């Protein structure tokens, strides 16, 4: 079974890697976390391909999630 990794990085917080059993679970977790961060920090989540970026209205990036399929 292939493992799907999500790489999370945030300015001032460093980075972390999370592993999921399938792509659907990984994407659901990314979207949930991105919404939460956007709500807490007044940003907006933008999903493009295998990546979600949360940024403030001026464009300053708050956090990023990248899907890595193995």
Regions found by a protein language model. Give the residues of each.
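Short linear proline/tyrosine/threonine-rich motifs used for host-factor recruitment
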Residues: 4, 17-19, 54, 64
């Amino acid at each position: 079974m292939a493992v799907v990794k999500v790489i999370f990085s945030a300015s001032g917080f460093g980075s972390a890697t999370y592993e999921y059993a399938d792509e659907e679970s990984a994407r659901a977790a990314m979207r949930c976390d991105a919404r939460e961060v956007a709500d807490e920090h007044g940003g907006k989540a933008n999903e493009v391909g295998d990546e979600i970026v949360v940024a403030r209205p001026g464009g300053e990036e708050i956090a990023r999630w990248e899907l890595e399929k193995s």
